[in-house]
Amino acid sequence: MLNDVFADARDRMSKALDNLETDYKRLRTGRASVSLVDGIRAEYYGTPTALNQLATITIPEPRTIMIQPWDTSVIGEIEKSILKSELGLTPMSDGKVIRINIPVLTADRRRELVKVVKKMSEESKVAVRNIRRDVNEMIKDLKKEKEISEDEQFKAQEETQRITDDFIKKIDVVYSAKEKEILEI
C-alpha cells in the first residue's frame, strides 16, 4: 500500500524532472540542436506537420541547423513556420535545403537565459514539493483510516522526504549543467 504511494510519487516527480529537461532543450543557447526546431509545425497539404516528419534535420556545424525536406515544394512553408516560431531564428534557403545559423549569444542574453533557466528549475522544485505534500496527505489519510500505525506514518513521511530530496538534487544537477552550457563561450 505504501509502496504504491511511493511508486506514484517517484513517477510524478520523475515526470516533473522530464518536463524540465524538455523545456531546457527548447531554449536557444547559442549552440545548434535538433531539439530547437522540435516543436515547429509546417503546413503540408493543409495539415500542420512536425518538421521531423517532413525533412531530415542535421547539425553540420556547431552553430548551424540544416533542414533537408523530402518534398522541396514545402520549403516555403517550413521557412514561414520557422519565422513564426518566435525563436528568433532566420532560415536561409537555396531551394533544396534550409540552413539556420544560430547567432552567438551576447553576455546580456546569457545572463537573461540563466535567470529563465533558474526560474524553470524553481518551478520544477515547487512541483516536486507539491507532490510531496499530496503524498503526505495520502499518508495522513491512511493513518486516519487506521490502515497504518503512527510509527509507519512517520517512517513513510521520512521516506517521502528522502525521495523529494533526491529529486531536488537531480533538478539542481540538471540546472547546473544547463547554466554551465549557457555561460560557456
Swiss-Prot record:
The protein's role, per its UniProt record: Responsible for the release of ribosomes from messenger RNA at the termination of protein biosynthesis. May increase the efficiency of translation by recycling ribosomes from one round of translation to another.
Keywords: Cytoplasm, Protein biosynthesis
Gene name in the database record: frr
UniProt keyword Cytoplasm, yes or no: yes
GO terms for MF: ribosomal large subunit binding
A biological-process GO annotation: translational termination
Stored Pfam families: RRF
Identification of the protein by name: Ribosome-recycling factor
